[in-house]
Amino acid sequence: MAAKFEVGSVYTGKVTGLQAYGAFVALDEETQGLVHISEVTHGFVKDINEHLSVGDEVQVKVLAVDEEKGKISLSIRATQAAPEKKESKPRKPKAAQVSEEASTPQGFNTLKDKLEEWIEMSNRKDLIKK
């Protein structure tokens, strides 16, 4: 099998079956491989049936050949040019808003200080349930 189909080579195949996880492509009369759903096209593929049908002729690139298991991993996406990415505007970071009473000049609170504050708050009469 490895002598017939080299990793990195591109072949023409015929889609013989579709599953939720990918498409089976016949490379010749006795050999077929699997194109995983993530390798069908650039971008997200929700339903493989929207992109492929049984009987379609497709160009596939061999990603891996597993001699022991007799499996060939294929990719249609690797034979296609990647779409151009839109230039996005750089985002401005949001300024952090820290209340002055909740932090020390260094920017953090010690547990000791917060504990004393919590005890004072719990002793306030307007918070005590009747």
From Swiss-Prot:
Main location (coarse class): cytoplasm
**Record keyword Glycoprotein present:** no
GO MF annotation list = nucleic acid binding
Q: What induces it?
A: By heat shock, salt stress, oxidative stress, glucose limitation and oxygen limitation.
Region Disordered: list its residue ranges.
76-109
* Example of a GO cellular component annotation carried by this entry: cytoplasm
The record's NCBIfam families line, in alphabetical order, gives: PRK08059.1, S1_dom_CvfD
Give the multimer and partner information.
Answer: Found in association with the 30S subunit of the ribosome.
Q: What is this protein called?
A: General stress protein 13
> What does the organism's lineage look like at the top?
Bacteria, Bacillati, Bacillota, Bacilli, Bacillales
